[in-house]
């Protein structure tokens, strides 16, 4: 049994705990400092996630952010980041306080940032933050692919790509999280997978917006 720590109780971070638990791992879902009330609400309602509109497995350990440090008393085998792209700076600084060399970090967060007028992937940004805080031997992987949080929670068959410059690392992560409904492929092109995942989301938003604008129920204000 592996110990998996998921930071961020949003839709995808929460949904990701389902295959992790089905693979018989010990999984903790830690809300961010902005999600304390959200975590309390879930615990009071039998792990019911109001966004996903379903109950998460009873084996899942839900915790407020104040318990984050305690999770490192016994080193986790995998840290999963499920915060949005605007929270990467905060998450990187918080992880820096407790991170020890070579714990694998898996990014669910997708997007591109700009630094010095150049594009930067989320993995590059996180690595830069951790290095700025004095950490070395940083181990960051990313996931890309057509996978929806609601589908994953309901165990709809999904296929994703795990990327790391060291492909053996993502193969090891794959063994922790792969199930018969959540299949994983592997790539050593971390930047390529991240860029494609971000661009794919841009197209998805454009298509979604176009469908909404063409809907007969769309108001003139929206159009």
Regions found by a protein language model. Give the residues of each.
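NAD(P)+-binding Rossmann beta1-loop-alpha1 motif at the extreme N-terminus of oxidoreductases
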Residues: 1-56, 60-67, 115
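Conserved active-site and cofactor/substrate-binding residues in soluble primary-metabolism enzymes
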Residues: 7, 11, 15, 37, ...
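Short beta-strand/turn micro-motifs composed of small residues
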Residues: 8, 31, 107-109, 144, ...
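Conserved beta-strand segments of alpha/beta enzyme cores
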Residues: 26, 61-63, 104, 139-141, ...
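Rossmann-like NAD(P)(H) cofactor-binding subdomain of soluble oxidoreductases
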Residues: 65, 73-156
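Internal alpha-helical scaffold of NAD(P)-dependent oxidoreductase catalytic cores
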Residues: 98, 132-139, 157-223
């Amino acid at each position: 049994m592996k110990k998996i720590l998921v930071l961020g109780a949003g839709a995808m971070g929460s949904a990701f705990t389902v295959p992790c638990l089905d693979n018989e791992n010990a999984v903790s879902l830690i809300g961010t400092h902005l999600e304390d009330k959200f975590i309390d609400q879930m615990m009071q309602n039998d792990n019911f996630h109001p966004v996903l509109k379903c109950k998460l497995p009873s084996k899942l350990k839900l915790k407020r952010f104040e318990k984050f440090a305690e999770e490192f008393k016994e080193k986790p085998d995998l840290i999963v980041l499920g915060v949005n792209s605007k929270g990467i700076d905060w998450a990187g600084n918080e992880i820096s306080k407790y991170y020890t060399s070579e714990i694998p970090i898996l990014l669910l967060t997708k997007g591109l940032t700009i630094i010095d007028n150049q594009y930067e992937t989320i993995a590059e940004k996180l690595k830069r933050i951790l290095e700025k805080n004095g950490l070395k031997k940083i181990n960051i992987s990313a996931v890309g692919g057509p996978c929806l949080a609601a589908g994953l929670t309901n165990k709809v068959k999904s296929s994703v790509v795990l990327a790391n410059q060291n492909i053996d690392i993502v193969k090891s992560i794959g063994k922790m999280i792969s199930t018969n409904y959540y299949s994983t492929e592997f790539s050593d092109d971390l930047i390529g997978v991240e860029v494609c995942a971000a661009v794919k989301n841009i197209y998805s938003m454009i298509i979604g917006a176009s469908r909404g604008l063409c809907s007969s129920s769309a108001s003139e204000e929206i159009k």
